[in-house]
């Protein structure tokens, strides 16, 4: 069971390596917060079990995505009590609670990120240091995502009616 694993001061980038995912922002943040462990999942040859162990141990699943339709990895993180740190844009806008969103303009591109870097760093520190207090909110977020976006109940009801 990946939920309830001992958490590390770890931030995960679970996305594919593509320009619109803005890995450069994640890498720059790692240089400014070296006291935390930073994992880019796609640079490793992970089994599913290894991937879920990393999620289970992480405190944050980070996104600065400029393109996203559903964002399964952030949901997976929430299921194992990791903070889904997402921009207030794209599908994240309607899917995630305000507690886990940061202003879209902070990461619209690398230049915008450099202007808002300290604010992002402060938010990461808050999520890491106060993670235990955030767990009830993460549970609420995961339940909301499951009920509204990651269920086929309504689809099956429509098909079978």
PLM regions with names:
Residues 65-66:
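Aromatic "clamp/platform" in nucleotide-sugar-dependent glycosyltransferases that forms part
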Residues 52-58:
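Short alpha-helical donor nucleotide-sugar binding micro-motif in glycosyltransferases
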Residues 88-104:
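Short acidic/histidine- and often glycine-rich active-site loop of Leloir-type glycosyltransferases
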Residues 23-50, 132:
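A conserved nucleotide-sugar
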Residues 1-21, 27-31:
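Conserved donor-binding/catalytic core segment of Leloir-type glycosyltransferases
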Residues 83-86:
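Short hydrophobic beta-strand element within catalytic cores of glycosyltransferases
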Residues 107-160:
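A charged, aromatic-enriched C-terminal amphipathic alpha-helix characteristic of glycosyltransferases
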Residues 52, 75-79, 90-94:
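Short alpha-helical segment that forms part of, or immediately flanks, the ligand-binding pocket
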């Amino acid at each position: 069971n990946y939920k309830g694993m001992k958490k590390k001061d770890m931030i995960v980038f679970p996305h594919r390596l593509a320009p619109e995912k803005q890995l450069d922002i994640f890498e720059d943040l790692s240089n400014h917060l070296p006291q935390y462990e930073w994992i880019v999942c796609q640079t490793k040859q992970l089994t599913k079990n290894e991937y879920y162990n990393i999620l289970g141990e992480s405190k944050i699943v980070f996104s600065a995505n400029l393109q996203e339709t559903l964002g399964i990895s952030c949901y997976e993180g929430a299921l194992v009590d990791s903070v889904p740190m997402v921009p207030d844009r794209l599908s994240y806008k309607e899917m995630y609670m305000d507690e886990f969103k940061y202003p879209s303009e902070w990461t619209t591109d690398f230049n915008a990120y450099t202007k808002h870097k300290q604010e992002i760093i402060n938010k990461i520190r808050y999520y890491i240091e106060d993670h235990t207090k955030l767990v009830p909110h993460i549970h609420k977020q995961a339940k909301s995502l499951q009920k509204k976006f990651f269920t086929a109940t309504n689809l099956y009801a429509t098909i079978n009616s």
